[in-house]
Curated annotation (Swiss-Prot):
GO cellular component: plasma membrane
Organism placement in taxonomy: Bacteria, Pseudomonadati, Thermodesulfobacteriota, Desulfovibrionia, Desulfovibrionales
GO molecular function, one term: manganese ion transmembrane transporter activity
Record organism: Oleidesulfovibrio alaskensis (strain ATCC BAA-1058 / DSM 17464 / G20) (Desulfovibrio alaskensis)
InterPro entries hit by this protein: Mntp/YtaF (IPR003810), Put_MntP (IPR022929)
Gene: mntP
Topology of this chain in the membrane: Multi-pass membrane protein
Entry protein name: Putative manganese efflux pump MntP
HAMAP family, A to Z: MntP_pump
Key word Ligase present: no
Subcellular location: Cell inner membrane
Family stated for the protein in its record: Belongs to the MntP (TC 9.B.29) family.
Amino acid sequence: METPALLALAVALAMDALAVAVATGCRLRTVSARQTLRLAWHFGLFQAAMPIAGWFMGQGIRSFVDAWAHWIAFGLLAFIGLKMLKEAFEHDDAECGMADPTRGTSLIMLSVATSIDALAVGVTLSMLGLSIWMPAAVIGLVCLGLTAAGVQLGRVLAASSALSRYAEILGGAVLLGIGFKILHESGVFG
C-alpha cells in the first residue's frame, strides 16, 4: 500500500477516536497527562490490533464482520453515551460522581467501539494479499496522535464558560451521534 493511501486510511479510521477524544476532554474538563496518554495509548493500541486480528481472520469471517460490526460499535457507543447523559442530569455538580472514561470498562468499550471498523480493514487487506504490519503500525500511531490532540482540544473547549456547563451532555450526544452515523453508513436506515 502506498504511503499517501495508507495515511489517508489511518486518518479516516481515527476520526471516530478523535471525536470520542474531544468528547472525553470536554467531559473531564481538567485532564491530566496520564489520562490523555492512557486514552491515546488504548485507542492507538486497539486501532493497530484490530486490523491485525481482521487480517488473520481473513475471508472466512468477512460476512460476520460486515453483518454485525456496525451493531456492535453502535451498542457500545450508545451505552456509554446514554450513561454520560444520565450522569449529566443526575448530578448538580458536574464533577460529582463522574466516572473517568479513561479507566476501566468504559475505556475498553470505547477502545473497541472506535476501532471496530479497523477489523474490517484488516479482513480487506488480507483478501487483497497485502502485508498488515506496516499499515497496522501507521494506523495505530496516527490514532494515538489524533486522540491525544482531541482530548486536549476537548479540554480547551470545555474551559469556555458557554460550553463548560453542558460538556457532559455534549460528550454523550457526540457518542450517540457517532453510533447513529455508523448505522447510517452501513445502510441500516435505507
